[in-house]
């Protein structure tokens, strides 16, 4: 089993694909996609999935943020499918699987991803690291609501945490015993305690002013 990404594919992605993420703001920018790539490669080694396919899926997964966020996963899949350069390394069947994986990555989708590649990128995109989740949520709220003050951002942040990550939230994990399981429990403990959640919010909010 190949454990390392092809250098040729990596060079293509790093020069032609990843720079596009500089257009998307910090919450969905280069830092985020690089974390998703890192998480995906770790899961590829655990699951035995094709590491080159996993890498490409992770690299393309948010390219659709160039359009409406609500359909960005669909747009990202179309971008991948239409990129003829990928035919140098992948068959048409592999490209179709990668397109579907990109489409299936969105956290609010209740449908199980159609392949292991969709499960990997969905799991990697969850990226359940408490500080990282809080930071990205605050950055996203500020980027998309430039006129709102700190208290209004807090309300948006707290609502998002409850809606997505709480015990009744919509987030789903698809790979059993992944690192995300333990992290999600710790995150939920913080969300349950609004005073602790507010402390974390204040600390991060002040650090990014």
Each model region followed by its residue ranges:
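Short alpha-helical hairpin
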Residues: 1-19
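Short amphipathic alpha-helical interaction patches enriched in hydrophobic/aromatic residues
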Residues: 17, 21, 44, 62-67, ...
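Divalent metal-dependent phosphate-bond-processing catalytic cores, especially two-metal-ion Mg2+/Mn2+ enzymes
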Residues: 22-49, 60, 110-209
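Short, well-structured alpha-helical segments
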Residues: 30, 34-37, 55, 92-103
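An active-site-proximal "capping" alpha-helix that borders the catalytic cofactor pocket
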Residues: 36, 71-86
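His-Asp-centered metal-binding catalytic motifs of divalent-metal-dependent phosphohydrolases/nucleases
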Residues: 51-68, 72-76, 97-106
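Hydrophobic, well-structured mid-protein blocks that either form specific transmembrane helices
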Residues: 79-114
């Amino acid at each position: 089993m190949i454990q390392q990404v092809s250098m040729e594919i990596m060079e293509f992605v790093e020069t032609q694909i990843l720079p596009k993420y500089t257009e998307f703001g910090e919450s969905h920018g280069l830092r985020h996609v690089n974390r998703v790539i890192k998480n995906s490669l770790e899961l590829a080694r655990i699951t035995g999935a094709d590491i080159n396919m996993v890498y490409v899926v992770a690299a393309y997964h948010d390219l659709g943020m160039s359009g409406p966020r609500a359909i960005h996963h669909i747009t990202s899949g179309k971008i991948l499918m239409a990129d003829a350069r990928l035919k140098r390394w992948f068959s048409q069947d592999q490209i179709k699987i990668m397109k579907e994986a990109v489409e299936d990555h969105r956290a609010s989708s209740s449908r199980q991803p159609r392949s292991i590649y969709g499960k990997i990128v969905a799991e990697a995109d969850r990226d359940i690291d408490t500080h990282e989740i809080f930071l990205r949520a605050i950055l996203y709220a500020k980027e998309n609501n430039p006129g709102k003050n700190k208290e209004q951002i807090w309300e948006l942040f707290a609502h998002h945490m409850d809606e997505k990550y709480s015990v009744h939230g919509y987030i789903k994990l698809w790979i059993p015993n992944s690192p995300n399981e333990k992290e999600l429990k710790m995150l939920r403990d913080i969300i349950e305690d609004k005073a602790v959640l507010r402390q974390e919010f204040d600390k991060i909010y002040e650090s990014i002013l």
